[in-house]
């Protein structure tokens, strides 16, 4: 991620195709050591591609991925089918928590 962030920073700064040396210089300016293997792979993958087009393409791919909102409803349905015994246990645990929290009321740390 740090290599990609430095690459994007350079493109925002006006350098259309940053080199590995450019990215390495940005990282070293803030005290981060660059990994040459990862940096070379990043440069080769992004060579000849427009960063703005890649971002737009990635955004459209992410938009098509389900966010998982429907998965919670299915899990809740399975928990409700477990029966009344499962519902009684959490209520007892909540009551115990209330009792424990009342023990500390009115006591100061440095009294």
Curated annotation (Swiss-Prot):
Plays an important role in the elongation step of protein synthesis. InterPro entries: P1/P2_N_sf, Ribosomal_P1/P2, Ribosomal_P1/P2_euk, Ribosomal_P2. GO terms for biological process: cytoplasmic translational elongation. The keyword Transmembrane does not apply. Residues 62-111 are annotated as: Disordered. Keywords: Phosphoprotein, Ribonucleoprotein, Ribosomal protein. GO terms for cellular component: cytosolic large ribosomal subunit. Signal peptide: none annotated. Transmembrane segments: none annotated. It comes from Podospora anserina. GO terms for molecular function: structural constituent of ribosome. P1 and P2 exist as dimers at the large ribosomal subunit. The modification Phosphoserine is found at residue 101. Residues 76-88 have a biased composition (Low complexity). Belongs to the eukaryotic ribosomal protein P1/P2 family. Gene3D superfamilies: 1.10.10.1410. This is Large ribosomal subunit protein P2.
């Amino acid at each position: 991620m740090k290599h990609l962030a430095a690459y994007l920073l350079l493109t925002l700064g006006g350098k259309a195709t940053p080199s590995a040396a450019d990215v390495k210089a940005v990282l070293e300016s803030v005290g981060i050591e660059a990994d040459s293997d990862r940096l070379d792979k990043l440069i080769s993958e992004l060579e000849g591609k427009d960063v703005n087009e890649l971002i737009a393409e990635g955004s459209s791919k992410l938009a098509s991925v389900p966010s998982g909102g429907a998965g919670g409803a299915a899990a809740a349905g399975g928990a409700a089918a477990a029966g009344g015994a499962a519902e009684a246990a959490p209520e007892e645990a909540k009551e115990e928590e209330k009792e424990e929290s009342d023990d500390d009321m009115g006591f100061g740390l440095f009294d």
